[in-house]
Amino acid sequence: MIKKSLMAAAVALSAVVYFNVSGQTADAPSAKEAKDTKSSGQKAVQQKAEKAAPNRTANAAKAFEKVSKELYPEAKKEGNLIVYSVWDVEHIRAVTDGFAKRYPGIKTTYWQGRNPEIVTRVLTEFQGGQPSVDTILSDNAPSVLRAAGAMASYETVQKDVLVLHDPTLPTVSLQVQALTYNTKKLKSADLPKSWEDVANPKYKGLIALDDPMRAGPLSSMLAGLWTQWNDQTRFNNFIKGLKALNVPVHKSTSAMFRLVVAGEYAICMPALLHDVIHDKEKGTPIDYVKSVPPVVFPRQAGIYAKAPHPNAAKLFAEWLISDEGQKTIDAIGRESSRNDFKSKTSIEVAFPKGTKAIPVTDKLYLEDPKKWLDTYVKPIWEG
């Protein structure tokens, strides 16, 4: 019953995500742009974006203060906030404790689980009519649950400062995927020049590959490349190239990353930017290819359709996106969702100016990752 509900809703509903990075786009550069990245037209666009940025920041701050004053009294009456999240327990505690400190009188509780566990639990509760949870803080789960009709629609008042904006699911953080390598195992001259280059036969035996069929970082990266390339043949050849490397696939990105750090592999396909920077600062032989654009995937604070404390859930989402909330998220090592928030994991700080990040915006992938993988990847990967 749950599976049928997911499939039917995935066809009926649409996911709209807007890529809103100042000075960046999701489109591949044209030949003219590649030859002349300093054209007067581009300079004008960049200058206009930079000039508008302070206004967007100020307007977002005003909008947050206004909605905060409106929501807090109602949220305080509700008295509680219940969060389900895929985040690490210490990370969930950091953001829920920070929220409770900012808004006294609202008690926070949480349950931590993997995305499939969250989806199954929420759908069971939704079909049973249970007002069990307020916020789903995760990456894949909110959009999958939206497709099943289990999420309420809420658009943040701070949308203009978001890198990835979804008009129904507030994006509070980003999963930024970087092409990562062990500096002792691979020289700079031998680095892959692009994500596509990783499938080059010369890297056979050097790559730690995430399982592309488990709906993890590699699968979302593939969804981002699928949209950017818009080329079935090119995409199919890339999957064939990865398969031809004949390397073991890994079920845990963090465990895979540790193997690359230890020198058992030279390349991590892919790794999360905050993990790479964290380990690099500790002096481990790890770095990322800064010339290869990162893939960005939204982490959202979706509101459950039957939330018992809807005002607290809205306030929590707005606080997470606010400057204070983003500082809390940054402190636990997760990437900001704002294009005006500068930290060591910000795209505009961690990558060269003008880097065109690759967003994951595919409708089917966001709503039903398994169906997307079964449609576009499985026939080649397992064929």
Regions found by a protein language model. Give the residues of each.
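Extracellular/periplasmic bilobal clamshell ligand-binding domains
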Residues: 345-383
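Short, polar/charged alpha-helical segment
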Residues: 48-50, 65-76, 82, 86-107
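Periplasmic-binding protein-like
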Residues: 174-175, 202-213, 238-243, 249-250, 280-307, 320-343, ...
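A ligand-binding cleft/hinge motif common to bilobed small-molecule-binding domains
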Residues: 142-147, 266-286
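Short amphipathic alpha-helical coupling segments at ligand-binding clamshell hinges
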Residues: 95, 234-238, 308-320, 328-331
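A bilobed periplasmic-binding-protein/Venus flytrap-type ligand-binding module shared by bacterial periplasmic
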Residues: 178-185, 222-227, 297-312, 328-329
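Extracytoplasmic ligand-binding site segments that recognize negatively charged/polar headgroups
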Residues: 82-97, 108-126, 131-264
